[in-house]
Amino acid sequence: MKEFCIDFGEEQMEKLRQRIGCTRLPRTLNEGNWSLGTDSNYLQTLLDYWCDGYDWSRKQRELNQYPQFTCELDGVTIHFFHIPGSNKGAMPLLLTHGWPDSFLRYAKVFPLLSDYDLVVPSLPGFAFSTLPS
């Protein structure tokens, strides 16, 4: 088992911004009417926010305040949070996400579950866990 820290450097973030900026949205038949597909104006607003408005560094710092680890299981690297409970002998609580999701679903409730010994894995192929070969 190894300690883990989320560490996206500025170079990685710039590449992400470039990829987001290069996204070409399909033409839609009826803007604002979601019955015919996603509203491309909404998607463009979302892409702009991810490039220029979202504070990726702040989110990284928020997540790194909690202990994270990786371990190797049958050749697959599994990423997980292990947040010890506030009391010795706290009841363990395993929080697992589904598809298509990630541990981020639970990050907001970590502080609310401090009475429990939390284990929150990233399923194989999600977030920082690798896919089986």
Which ranges hold each PLM region?
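Mature N-terminal segment immediately following signal peptide/propeptide cleavage
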Residues: 1-23
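Catalytic cores of eukaryotic secretory-pathway lumenal/extracellular enzymes that build
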Residues: 4, 22-25, 41-133
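Zn2+-dependent metallopeptidase catalytic domains
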Residues: 26-31
